[in-house]
């Protein structure tokens, strides 16, 4: 994370040619957020979810078309205004996953 912390902006450009990629949560995006660095991201649903109100600034609709102009337009104020999204710990993520499995199993059991 030390090298990432030294960056003004990170890039998280994922080709979204298949559903698996479009629904992914890229490690590079999470590393940038953990370092407190904004990431210019491909139009991934998880990037939009984590960025919330900031998604319009940091998610590129068409990275191939928009990357250069997005990089050229970023100001120091944009970087300073960036609010790092809350990233769940492994334990929090595991607890939510376990709860989702339990709900699915309960639902399945009641529909038999």
Question: Where on the chain are the PLM-derived regions?
Answer:
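CheY-like receiver
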Residues: 2-6, 70-73, 96, 100
């Amino acid at each position: 994370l030390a090298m990432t912390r030294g960056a003004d902006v990170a890039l998280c450009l994922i080709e979204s040619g298949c559903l698996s990629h479009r629904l992914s949560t890229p490690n590079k995006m999470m590393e940038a957020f953990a370092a407190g660095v904004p990431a210019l991201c491909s139009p991934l649903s998880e990037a939009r979810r984590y960025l919330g109100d900031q998604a319009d600034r940091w998610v590129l609709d068409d990275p191939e078309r928009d990357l250069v102009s997005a990089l050229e337009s970023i100001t120091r104020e944009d970087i300073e205004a960036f609010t790092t999204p809350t990233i769940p710990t492994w334990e929090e993520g595991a607890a939510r996953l376990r709860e989702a499995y339990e709900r699915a199993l309960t639902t399945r059991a009641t529909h038999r």
